[in-house]
Every structure is written in structure tokens, then in C-alpha cells.
Amino acid sequence: MAQGRRVERVAALIRKETSELLIHGIRDERVHQGMVSITEVEVSGDLQHCRIFVSVFGEQAQKDEVMDGLEAARGFLRGELGRRLQMRRAPEIVFKLDLGIEKGTTVLHLLGELERERDERGDVTEGTELPDNP
């Protein structure tokens, strides 16, 4: 159980430090193309591998540029994380584009459209009472 807590702590620290490095440490302009945020960090039990999930707000071309920039900065980030976290061996980093927020926004948009259509048709919505038929 202590091993699990350590992995969680390391993941939280990696998320914090990587967020800081995204703002102040990486000079590659590609990384600053869109609004970039780290949504999740997964670290293997042996602390040798790390998946960092990134959400990028912007067009697909901007997302591609940001991911290319992050890929190019992987070695720098790994070295900085090893130094900042004082780890003997920093984990190997893999960046993954997280589309969860984008998918959630799409679902909310679709639900809004359905609600507007229902209102236009005059359909009965949840919470309204049906007229009594004697």
C-alpha cells in the first residue's frame, strides 16, 4: 500500500513541476501555440515510465504543433524533473493528447441543441405536468 501512495505522490509532483516547466521552462514557441494544460499523470509502479495527458485548446493544427513541441522537449523535461524531484533516475516520459474535455464540450453542445429542439416543438420536458384527461 505504501508503494501506491508513493506512486501517487510522484505523479502529483510530476504534474506540478511539468506545469511549471510548461509556463517558465520550455522556450519552444510550438508549446505556446494554444492553451495547454496537464489533465492527468500516470506513473508506473517502478517509477520508470510516465504518461502525461495534455489538453490543448485550439484548432487541430495548433494541437499538432504543441504535441510536436512537447515531444521535442521530452529530454529537457525528463532531466529537469529528475533534478527537481531529486530522483536517481527520472521516468521516461510519453505525452498523450487528452480529448476528454473536448468530448465533454461536444456532448454539452449536443444536449443544448436537443433541448432547444424540444422547446421549439413544444414537447413535454421532465418536471412538467401532463394535463388530466377526464
From Swiss-Prot:
Keyword Cytoplasm set for record: yes
Primary localisation category: cytoplasm
Protein's cellular compartments: Cytoplasm
Matches recorded under InterPro entries: KH_dom-like_a/b, RbfA, RbfA_dom_sf, Ribosome-bd_factorA_CS
Keywords annotated in UniProt: Cytoplasm, Ribosome biogenesis
Gene3D superfamilies listed in its UniProt record: 3.30.300.20
Molecular function in Gene Ontology: ribosomal small subunit binding
Family matches, as SUPFAM superfamilies: Ribosome-binding factor A, RbfA (SSF89919)
Record carries keyword Cytoplasm: yes
GO cellular component: cytosol
GO BP terms in the entry: maturation of SSU-rRNA
HAMAP family per the UniProt record, alphabetical: RbfA (MF_00003)
Oligomer and partners: Monomer. Binds 30S ribosomal subunits, but not 50S ribosomal subunits or 70S ribosomes.
Family statement: Belongs to the RbfA family.
Functional description taken from the UniProt entry: One of several proteins that assist in the late maturation steps of the functional core of the 30S ribosomal subunit. Associates with free 30S ribosomal subunits (but not with 30S subunits that are part of 70S ribosomes or polysomes). Required for efficient processing of 16S rRNA. May interact with the 5'-terminal helix region of 16S rRNA.
This protein's name: Ribosome-binding factor A
Organism listed in the record: Synechococcus sp. (strain CC9311)
Gene name of this polypeptide: rbfA
